[in-house]
Regions:
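Short, conserved DNA-binding cores of transcription-related domains
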Residues: 1-81, 88
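Short, positively charged, Gly/Tyr-enriched micro-motifs
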Residues: 44-47, 57-154
Length: 154
């Protein structure tokens, strides 16, 4: 059987620690890889100038029966074009506390389950799930001209 490289789920980062808790949570502590330059969130250009960093805790998709949490430093970089901005992380939307993988999982679940059940299943707040579902509907349906709507049927 082959070894699974769990760090490959989070490109640009290395897993430096893992902690299991009794309440079915797993915490992975990540560290930026030295061979990856941070990129500006606005222009996506690599920049070696790091202003500071903050530790952020984000939610990842469940692994079997365990809730997965990631703890990672998010750096603010001094981009020569854009000024001081947070770095761009491919798998973590800007300012989000949920990874893209977790958001996609929630989007899939809300198509089949009520929001309340998705909230209980994932441990994510009802309002957060509702916002993710609104964004999904906006991208899939687009804007609707309500002036031409005559009836709403449920």
């Amino acid at each position: 059987m082959h070894h699974i490289d769990i760090a490959s789920f989070w490109p640009g980062y290395t897993v430096i620690a893992q902690a299991l808790s009794a309440n079915h949570h797993t915490l992975f502590t990540l560290e930026p890889r030295a061979d990856f330059l941070p990129r500006c969130r606005r222009c996506l250009q690599p920049t070696p100038l790091i202003h500071d960093q903050r530790i952020r805790r984000v939610r990842e998709r469940d692994l079997f029966d365990r809730q997965v949490w990631l703890q990672l430093p998010v750096r603010r970089v001094d981009c020569l074009r854009c000024g001081r901005v947070s770095e761009h992380i491919d798998w973590l939307p800007s300012g989000s506390r949920l990874t893209r993988r977790m958001q996609c999982w929630i989007e899939a679940l809300v198509q089949y389950l009520p929001i309340r059940h998705v909230s209980q299943l994932t441990g994510v707040g009802w309002h957060t799930i509702k916002e993710i579902d609104k964004r999904r509907l906006q991208t899939s349906v687009g804007t609707i001209e309500l002036g031409e709507v005559r009836r709403l049927v449920m």
